[in-house]
Design a protein with these regions (language model features):
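Acidic/histidine-rich, surface-exposed loop or edge segments in extracytoplasmic proteins
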Residues: 24-40, 83-84, 205-206
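C-terminal/domain-edge helix-coil "capping" segments
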Residues: 1-26, 113, 125-227
Length: 227
């Protein structure tokens, strides 16, 4: 059977059309920090590569993208003034400190640039099972993926429990205007970060060696996250 063009797991985006109409967005900057929960370390390492692809996508779609280092410099200066909003032990975000820092960054960037919006690109880890249909596909946030296999061996153990949840990653995009009000948010699936371990007799998932290695999947996740 042919796969449907619309994936029912497509994320329900939020858009404030009135704010966007009142002040159209042309010039943006991609933040190097997360808006929500901190990304897992193994995903955080891949974030600069994903951000570079997001920047290319935005430029192709007619936006002017300011260098991330501009944001980073102002962010670091504001952190020196107000403290780090992220608790290094728990990874929790202090929203009050975060708001103070963002207000300072906004004020500084408004002086020196024609910035219209800040874009946050969080790599979020979710869970999905490869339990759908004979091909064992997982669907989440608009994508359909088949499982990866890792390690020596031939195929998947007959005892493998396809209902086990595997770690998957999505790109969460949040856009804030110069009033620091949310104008858009959505999420696009990228790929599973777990693979089926062929060395296990009963079958289990292990972390993939090559995380976010498929550029096409990243591009699809970006496209979905901006729609």
């Amino acid at each position: 059977s042919s796969t449907p063009t619309y994936n029912p797991t497509t994320f329900p985006f939020q858009l404030d059309q009135a704010r966007l109409d009142a002040r159209p967005i042309k010039t943006v900057v991609i933040a190097h920090v997360n808006l929500g929960v901190q990304s897992r370390n193994y995903l955080d390492k891949e974030a600069p590569r994903v951000d570079a692809q997001v920047a290319s996508y935005l430029k192709e779609n007619g936006f002017k993208v300011l260098p991330q280092r501009d944001f980073e410099q102002h962010w670091n200066a504001a952190v020196r003034a107000f403290g780090n909003p992220v608790d290094p032990t728990s990874g929790k975000l202090n929203r009050k400190t975060f708001a103070l820092i963002m207000t300072r960054v906004r004020d500084e960037m408004a002086k020196s640039t024609k910035l219209d919006a800040f874009i946050f690109t969080d790599l979020v880890e979710l869970e999905a099972s490869f339990s759908e249909g004979l091909k064992h596909v997982a669907r989440w946030d608009g994508v359909t993926r088949t499982p990866s296999l890792q390690g020596p061996g031939d195929g998947v153990s007959a005892e493998f429990d396809w209902n086990i949840l595997a770690a998957v990653v999505s790109l969460q995009v949040s856009i804030y205007d110069m009033d620091l009000e949310p104008v858009f948010s959505s999420r696009g699936g990228i790929e599973a970060t777990d693979a089926i371990d062929r060395r296990s007799s009963t079958g289990r998932y292990v972390r993939r060696r090559n995380i976010l290695g498929n550029e096409t999947y990243i591009a699809e996740g970006i496209r979905l996250a901006f729609h």
